[in-house]
């Protein structure tokens, strides 16, 4: 009977639906994360809106320099009464009627000694500064994204270390349990192994929570709300161009490419142009205007008229307000120049720190990799010694702890190099 059931099961097995394989966890690449952040991050959206507003202010500053054209149309109905009485003692209307008017007027500023053109050029320079400010924010968003991505990738690598540690602890537990059952090892070895496995389980839970948390922070760095059920894998390490160069060459690149440096330089230009514009208030302005109009009391009796005017306007005394505005603008320019020098010094520090951090991290990776290899060999030797009966459970446990620590240090070394290169990118103003 059992044989019949077994044959029936073999016959029916191919017809049974196969269990669907679990879907693979999607992988979010660094390039994709950067693209999402550049498109969706709220800070960048706000910066783009501010740039659009600055561009609109350029148009507003240009408007007074262009011809101004206006039109008007009016209709008036009027009536009046005499001030003297008639023979009947009553006042009677003297006049009443309609009035129609149509007109077009044009005006043009001819010259104002740089008052209007200075405001326009200052607005253009301010727009340039805002564009660089937007780019500088994009550089910082990219750095924060890389930092969050590399942190999540390191957390995933540490999760793999925790999984390997738990797997090794379970293997050791089964081996030790078998030795204890046959009397080759004391009961205390089994208790120690169970404790080590429990600790490994706790470490695995903590590593999983850390990975989940870092993916949530990565979502925030991308500026999106999305599920965290995806994996991140750090791309292969690639050296940055010039990362092994000296500080002087990297500093030249940074000063010519960093958007915060260029933004402050444009702010200085805008302030100087604003000063020139204010000084135009000392001089007169010359404008011209002309108009054409038609007036009528009846719709069939229009009369054409025109006018033209040249206007020279000059504020002879304004209580010293122009002097005060000029002094204020010059002081603001001096303050911006001081900030510019301070920023140049900070750029040098940023470049120096990032360059040294990259060099130190590259050296640490080789040492961390060697330490991990030695720790793995040590664990293999400890396992062999324990199975041969010449080692003890403490030696075995310590070897596993040493391997876990060495693997974690290797992950940390890789993360440190990735983050150092990200800082160097930010220091030289690269996206």
PLM segments and residue spans:
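Acidic, low-complexity, intrinsically disordered peripheral segments
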Residues: 19-23, 79, 226, 407-431
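Short, charged, amphipathic alpha-helical segments
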Residues: 124, 187-195, 393-401
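Transmembrane beta-barrel architecture of outer-membrane proteins
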Residues: 99-101, 147, 192-195, 305-307, ...
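Small/polar-residue-enriched beta-strand and adjacent coil segments characteristic
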Residues: 29, 68-136, 257, 262-343, ...
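Amphipathic alpha-helical coiled-coil segments
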Residues: 46-61, 137, 141-162, 171-174, ...
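Periplasmic alpha-helical coiled-coil/stalk elements that build and connect Gram-negative outer-membrane
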Residues: 137-253, 354-357, 361, 410
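Bacterial Sec-pathway N-terminal export signals of envelope proteins
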Residues: 20-74, 109-110, 226, 232-268, ...
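Bacterial N-terminal signal peptides
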Residues: 6-15
């Amino acid at each position: 009977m059992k044989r019949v059931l077994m044959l029936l099961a073999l016959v029916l097995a191919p017809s049974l639906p196969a269990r669907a394989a679990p879907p693979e966890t999607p992988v979010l690449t660094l390039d994709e994360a950067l693209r999402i952040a550049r498109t969706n991050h709220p800070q960048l959206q706000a910066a783009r809106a501010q740039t659009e507003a600055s561009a609109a202010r350029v148009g507003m500053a240009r408007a007074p320099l262009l011809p101004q054209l206006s039109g008007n149309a009016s209709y008036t109905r009027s009536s009046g009464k005499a001030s003297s009485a008639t023979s009947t003692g009553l006042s009677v209307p003297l006049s009443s009627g309609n009035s129609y008017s149509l007109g077009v007027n044009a005006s043009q500023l001819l010259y104002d000694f740089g008052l209007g053109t200075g405001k326009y050029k200052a607005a253009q320079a301010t727009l340039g500064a805002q564009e660089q400010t937007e780019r500088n924010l994009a550089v910082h968003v990219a750095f924060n994204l890389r930092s969050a991505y590399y942190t999540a990738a390191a957390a995933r690598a540490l999760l793999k270390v925790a999984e390997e540690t738990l797997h090794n602890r379970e293997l050791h537990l089964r081996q030790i349990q078998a030795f204890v059952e046959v009397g080759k090892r004391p009961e205390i070895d089994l208790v120690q192994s169970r404790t080590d496995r429990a600790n490994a389980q706790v470490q695995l839970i903590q590593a999983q929570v850390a990975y989940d948390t870092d993916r949530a922070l990565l979502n925030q760095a991308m500026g999106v709300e999305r599920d965290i059920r995806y994996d991140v894998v750090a791309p292969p390490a690639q050296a940055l161009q010039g990362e092994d160069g000296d500080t002087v060459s990297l500093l030249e690149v940074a000063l010519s490419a960093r958007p915060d440096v260029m933004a402050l330089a444009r702010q200085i230009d805008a302030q100087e142009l604003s000063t020139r514009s204010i000084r135009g208030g000392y001089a007169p302005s010359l404008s011209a205007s002309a108009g054409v109009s038609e007036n009528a009391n009846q719709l069939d009796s229009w009369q054409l008229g025109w006018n033209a005017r040249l206007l020279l306007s000059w504020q002879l005394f304004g209580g010293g307000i122009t002097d005060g505005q000029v002094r204020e603008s010059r002081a603001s320019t001096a303050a911006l120049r001081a900030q510019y020098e301070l920023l140049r010094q900070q750029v040098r520090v940023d470049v120096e720190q990032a360059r040294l951090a990259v060099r130190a991290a590259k050296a640490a990776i080789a040492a961390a990799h060697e330490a991990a290899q030695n720790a793995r060999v040590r664990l293999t030797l400890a396992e062999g010694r324990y199975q041969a009966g010449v080692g003890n459970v403490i030696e075995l446990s310590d070897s596993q702890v040493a391997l876990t620590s060495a693997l974690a240090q290797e992950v940390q070394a890789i993360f440190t190099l990735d983050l150092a290169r990200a800082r160097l990118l930010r220091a030289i103003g690269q996206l």
